[in-house]
Amino acid sequence: MRRAPLFVVLGLLALALIVPVAGGELGFGSGNGAGASPSGVAAGASGQATLVPTTTSAATEGVAPSAPSAAPADPGSAPTPTSTPADPTPAPIAQLAEVPIVPVTQFRATVTNTTRKEVAAVLAGTSTRYEALELVAGEADAVLAALGVDRPSGLSHLVEAKDSATLSTDLAAHRKRLAFLRADAVGPSVRALAWGGDSLFGVDRVSALKDWPLNASLPVGDAASAFDPAATWTLFAGGDIMLDRGVAQALKVTGRGAAFPFSGGAADITSRYCCSPFGWKVPRLARAGDAGAVRKLISGADIALANFENPAPDHFTWHSKGTVFSADPALIDGIAKAGFDVMGIANNHIRDKGGPGLLQTVKNLKKRGLLTAGAGKDLTAARKPAVIEVGGVKVAILAYDAIAGSYHATATKIGSAPLAFKVVTADIKAARAAGADVVVVFPHWGVEYRGAAGAGQQRLARQVIDAGADMIIGNHAHWAAEMEIYKGKPIWYALGNLVFDQTWSEETMEGLTLELTFRGKGLAQVRMRPHAILDKAQPNFLDPAKDGKIVMDRVFKASPDLPW
């Protein structure tokens, strides 16, 4: 056998050592595979550089290397491409649309309208009514463009809030600010204003968005949250109506007729004189035009409600004085023709003509198309709500009395529904189970001739809200009284007189009406209108910035914790 020369053997041995090193299978770093860069950055499949973490060799740390978890890759195979994370999905671009925007100010404001000229004056610092214009930060430029005014430079009278909720809260703290909100962000804690005479809320609102003159290009959300005036509805609420005594005399003896009480318009207080039979100063009133405005408001509301504080039996007795009442059923015609829908009849006079007189009253009201709540042939009937559906929203009105216990119904007695917490709670639950979307509780309660609610009255009111009522509209005080917001729900303890002959004090000659606007199931706007009663029988609106201010101040003074 022939042996190879020594130099040939040495050459082959050297070649065997060199080739694996060149193939990358022998080294002191991590096995990055062919084509790896020493920096630990590999070319990914997309061609972009993607950071790949490197690993320190166990041998270099003085630790014996562990067995590989898999066989080494074939040095001749193609490298496995490094995966590159996908680019993050971009946020969807907000869709812009022409969105109705509404001028608003603080809840207690007496102003009802604003204009582009006034906005410009606010920004210029020349407005006598407002100190600043407040807008939502992300919407400010679009709103200013819609208003046709430029963004002020430098120190200005423009304030920007982070969102609509903050803006609404700001208006309560800074009562001399004008603001603009998208219509779908307007809530009851602010006062929505008309724009150049057009309104988006209330009885006189425009019927369609195409008729609203003020829109801004803003992001839109889902269609369900978009504002539609056709989906809004209104509720009118008034105080005590009594058709006996001086009222009957004013309507029948003088020949003014049943329609007279609701034919009023505006009135002014021209002076005050002394004195009434009780020794108090009372106002002298004069009509100031706009005849029929009261009827227009009542008839324009989708639901109109008041307290009917006397029986109207078939065989009535007119009383010239005293506190036992009964009314001519023919006078109900004026109530029905004014546009009322519901009469609350749970009060301390509804049984003044006994049980039969109460049932005849219910019959005479229903005969004229009026629903009743709060009294009936027995306790079950008395607790039955008046239910009205408006635009697919079912509204239940529950009425109760807390004054005349001897008039309360039982299982076998004709009478009124008692204002007892367990009764009200069960009735609210039953109304909800029957499909009510909105529940209004209408109690006759409290103390006469006092503006502030008593502690027990307030405690009960809060329990009723906790039980599921959406609002409480009370009466009996014969004064416009305290208002409270509890857990976002409004409570009016009393609205005062609407049609009554108590001309012996200013407080009993004045009252409030409510004009409430709802969006579906939710309350969107509140307007409280002060009025004074002329000729013992006819409410006429007072300007809340002038003569009506005394009524509004009386309410707000009695409401020290009102946040709006």
Residue ranges of each PLM-predicted region?
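N-terminal Sec-pathway targeting helices
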Residues: 1-12
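Acidic, metal/ion-coordinating pockets
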Residues: 224-564
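N-terminal non-cleavable signal-anchor helices
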Residues: 9-10, 22, 42, 53, ...
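Ser/Thr-rich, Proline-interspersed low-complexity disordered segments
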Residues: 17, 31-95, 561
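Flexible loop/hinge segments at secondary-structure junctions
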Residues: 85-227
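Short, flexible coil/linker elements and helix-boundary hinge sites characteristic
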Residues: 23-27, 47, 62, 148, ...
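Solvent-exposed helix-coil-helix hairpins and adjacent flexible coil/strand "hinge" segments
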Residues: 34, 180-185, 529-531
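Hydrophobic alpha-helical membrane-insertion segments, chiefly the h-region
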Residues: 11-26
